[in-house]
């Protein structure tokens, strides 16, 4: 779909319509920063439908598709790329909300995250970073930044208490007590009463919004600390992301 965009905008810009002025000029496509964020849903579905061995063996192929997308953008004139790795899957509260009994030893890490899921995410990110290094040599005119979203989000989980946040394995929105589970904004029963999954009073005190998605506070924190280069390779701010290092 992207390959059609430059040619279509060029065609529209030939006219004098006011709408044409809102479209990027052809020269701007090579100056743009292209952001790729892939892997989260691939692993989520993999955990649901595949054995761990099969999922692990599928990861190089998934990463190859990311690399192919970068190459296609490069061939279309793209030169600057901001590539996110995948986050700590095991640290999403949805993983533990239904656990009513104590987990087996080694199932959780010291912050309450499901260890095997984070291990798989780390493997995915290792393969992705190796591929990014290879892309840098294959695409000599490209500026490619690897963004370590995993480390940023894991740091937030690990330091939630220091930051004055609630237990990172709890959620702001939704009702999850014992065997009663009503998801954020959905209708359901709790203590034999009809309710709608409620929101907490202060979302800025929580890491997770609904067990899967992060709160606005968390997303802002991660954005600030990746945009300034704290969790990027090379370690430079987004303002420098369009420059080769």
Model regions and ranges:
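Mobile gating loops/cap/lid regions near enzyme active sites that modulate substrate access
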Residues: 88-115, 134-137, 141-212, 235-245
């Amino acid at each position: 779909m992207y390959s059609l965009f430059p040619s279509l905008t060029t065609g529209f810009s030939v006219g004098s319509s006011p709408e044409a002025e809102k479209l990027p000029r052809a020269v701007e496509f090579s100056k743009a920063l292209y952001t790729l964020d892939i892997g989260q849903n691939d692993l989520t579905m993999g955990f649901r439908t595949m054995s761990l061995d099969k999922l692990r063996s599928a990861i190089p192929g998934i990463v190859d598709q990311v690399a192919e997308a970068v190459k296609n953008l490069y061939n279309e004139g793209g030169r600057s790329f901001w590539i996110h790795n995948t986050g700590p899957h095991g640290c999403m509260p949805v993983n533990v909300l239904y656990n009513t009994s104590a987990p087996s030893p080694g199932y959780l890490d010291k912050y309450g995250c499901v260890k095997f899921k984070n291990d798989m995410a780390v493997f995915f990110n290792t393969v992705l970073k190796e591929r990014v290094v290879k892309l840098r040599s294959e695409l000599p005119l490209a500026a490619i930044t690897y963004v370590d979203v995993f480390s940023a989000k894991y740091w937030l989980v690990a330091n939630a208490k220091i930051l004055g946040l609630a237990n990172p394995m709890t959620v702001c929105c939704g009702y999850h007590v014992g065997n009663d589970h009503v998801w954020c904004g959905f209708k359901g029963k709790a203590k034999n009463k009809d309710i709608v999954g409620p929101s907490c009073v202060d979302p800025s005190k929580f890491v997770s919004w609904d067990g899967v998605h992060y709160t606005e506070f968390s997303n802002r924190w991660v954005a600030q600390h990746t945009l300034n280069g704290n969790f990027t390779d090379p370690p430079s701010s987004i303002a420098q992301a369009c420059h080769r290092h």
